[in-house]
Structures are given as structure tokens and as C-alpha cells.
């Protein structure tokens, strides 16, 4: 049986308002660990705020008989522009898909702890695949995840009795798309 569990103090309907990042930091304010290399010659092309969930599944731990842990299945979020218009969505891959049909798939390049230990880390992802012809995401080479709120795996509730259970943890973040 596949069960779903929504964790956190906010239900899905209120996630965007309650978890909206405060004034997102500028790209140059990102920790040095998640700034693209200077020889990449990239700059910020566009930014978006994400609001949704980080989804985890309760899975057996390989090599540890009887142990279970929350494993990231992926994000499920809507991307919004500065004026609140929906720009696209963000889902497992990790993939960002724009409303114009362009999409990118990222790979972890670097990470830094969020200022609040209760929040998921800030990331630098390199683009490993472009999908769709042209579009807003076509020139993107890196993505920064900044100003995260929430999204961490539950601290407990994952054991043999809860195998395959899904925890949908509310989160928000500010994504900066970098290219040339």
C-alpha cells in the first residue's frame, strides 16, 4: 500500500504564503562554495521563487538489515516570478520546466548549509541536459538554490511499519538561473 503523509505546520494550500522566502539574497551574496567558477563566465539570467514540497519515501537502508530512512524522491514545486506570475514548475531530476516548454536537468555541483539548520541546504547545480528547442532556459548553465525555508526530511516516523510511505515536506526557495 502506498500512503501519503504531509508534514510540517502548513498544509499545501497555505504553503506559498507561509513559506515564501524573505528578501532573497542577490547572486553575489551567495556563499563562495556555491558560486560558479570564474572561468565559467556566467551571470544571472532570471530568478524564480519556488513553493511546494520536498518529497521523501521511507526506504530500507542498503546493507543494514531492518533499518529504514527517509530518502529524497524529489521536489514538487511551482516557480513564480517577482510579480507572482507562474513561470513553470520544479520536479524530480532535478528538473526545472518553464511555461514556454524549455526545461533543464541539473546535477549537484556544490552545496552550503542554509543559515537556519532547519532548512535544506543551498546548492549550486550544473545543467547536464537541456530539453525543448530554444526557450528561456536554453542558455542556462548553472542553477543556484538560495533562501531555503523548510524541506528537510522528517526526523522520525520511518521504520518497517511505514515502508514506502511518502512524506511531503513544505519548502520554498529562491532559484537563480545563470548562463551567458
Protein language model features and the residues they cover:
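Bacterial signal peptide processing site
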Residues: 13-15
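Bacterial N-terminal signal peptides
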Residues: 2-9
Amino acid at each position: 500500500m502506498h500512503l501519503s503523509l504531509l508534514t510540517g505546520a502548513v498544509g499545501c494550500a497555505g504553503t506559498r504564503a507561509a513559506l515564501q522566502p524573505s528578501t532573497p539574497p542577490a547572486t553575489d551574496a551567495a556563499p563562495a562554495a556555491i558560486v560558479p567558477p570564474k572561468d565559467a563566465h556566467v551571470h544571472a539570467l532570471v530568478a524564480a521563487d519556488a513553493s511546494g514540497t520536498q518529497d521523501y519515501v521511507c526506504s530500507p537502508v542498503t546493507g543494514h538489515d531492518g533499518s529504514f530512512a527517509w530518502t529524497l524522491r524529489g521536489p514538487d514545486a511551482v516557480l513564480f516570478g517577482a510579480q507572482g506570475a507562474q513561470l513553470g514548475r520544479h520536479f524530480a531530476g532535478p528538473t526545472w520546466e518553464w511555461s514556454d516548454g524549455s526545461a533543464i536537468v541539473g546535477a549537484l555541483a556544490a552545496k552550503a548549509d542554509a543559515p537556519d539548520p532547519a532548512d535544506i541546504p543551498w546548492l549550486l547545480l550544473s545543467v547536464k541536459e537541456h530539453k525543448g528547442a530554444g526557450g528561456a532556459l536554453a542558455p542556462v548553465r548553472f542553477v543556484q538554490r538560495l533562501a531555503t525555508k523548510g524541506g528537510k526530511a522528517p526526523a522520525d516516523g520511518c521504520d518497517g511499519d511505514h515502508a514506502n510511505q511518502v512524506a511531503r515536506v513544505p519548502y520554498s526557495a529562491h532559484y537563480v538561473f545563470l548562463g551567458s
